[in-house]
């Protein structure tokens, strides 16, 4: 039963393709007409705009036809070097848009494709004219003997070896053309600055100018806190309450040692720096948002936990530090958590003139010191020990100073290099 089905399938296949076989036309070729010429190219390709011309003497057959093309420096020649009395026949298939073959056209295959440096050709002509023809090397003589008396297999191997042979002087003369091609191919490649900028975009950090020439230009305040939001921060009630017990209650997050120390210091000055006060308030808002992130789906609850800030500030937090899940809910992912912390770190660096204590902020943000060091490096900082003068100014003893490091932002910024996987054996 299976054999009958198989035979039936074969008959159906032959019947379905019988029409195709009848539709194929084989075009005859007379001795006088020239067929399409086909060759194979390996190695250095001629430029696309190279024009080739047919070279064929009137008293020669189509077998001896060749193609020659030239650029300013190189001559390309495709020809037939076969010594066989009987040659293989080649043809080209002409297909329609569906891929169905409609015509078969006889073609001529040129089995060698050579490149010659025009400058070397002129030099060879000059030497031959001056010294006469010089006999070839032993290898060339052996190759000539092989072509004359060798088997078809050896003749084919000799011709392939000759076609693919690379000469040192040839490479020396075409190097300019190769370099030009490489330059064109690499024009679209990104520069080191482009790569650094792209890597910065992949990091959970505020917008950064990796090529900044001054530390103030590395992180612009308006890129971290938009101007509309910055101007919406209302700090007058805070400034009117010099008592810490009063103004601390007005902050979105009350338990930050960093904020409380600097706000107290700020209020002790006769003329308060309102810009710095607004930055401290926004740092406190980010800290409150960080610890209230699980309430981000309920705006009313979130507003209460953030101490009722202006709506534009809540909108900005949700826009920059949340993402929408597949079911339409809003959440703060682990990457967004790192992003919030990085924004806080950069703002703290701005407040502390780009050098701040790592341990203080690690405790404020409830992260391990190692994690804080990692995120400081992510924003471009260097982790450094305190100098003896700095230690004494901070009132730290030598034992405590071992646990305290400072994160310093310097130009040029230094970012961690991308991690690479281990090489496989």
Swiss-Prot record:
Gene Ontology molecular functions: DNA binding
Protein name: DNA-directed RNA polymerase I subunit rpa49
Quaternary structure and interacting proteins, as annotated: Component of the RNA polymerase I (Pol I) complex consisting of 14 subunits.
Ranges of Basic and acidic residues composition bias in the record: 15-24
Region of interest (Disordered), ranges: 1-26
Protein function: DNA-dependent RNA polymerase catalyzes the transcription of DNA into RNA using the four ribonucleoside triphosphates as substrates. Component of RNA polymerase I which synthesizes ribosomal RNA precursors.
InterPro entries linked: RNA_pol-assoc_fac_A49-like
Keyword Transcription listed: yes
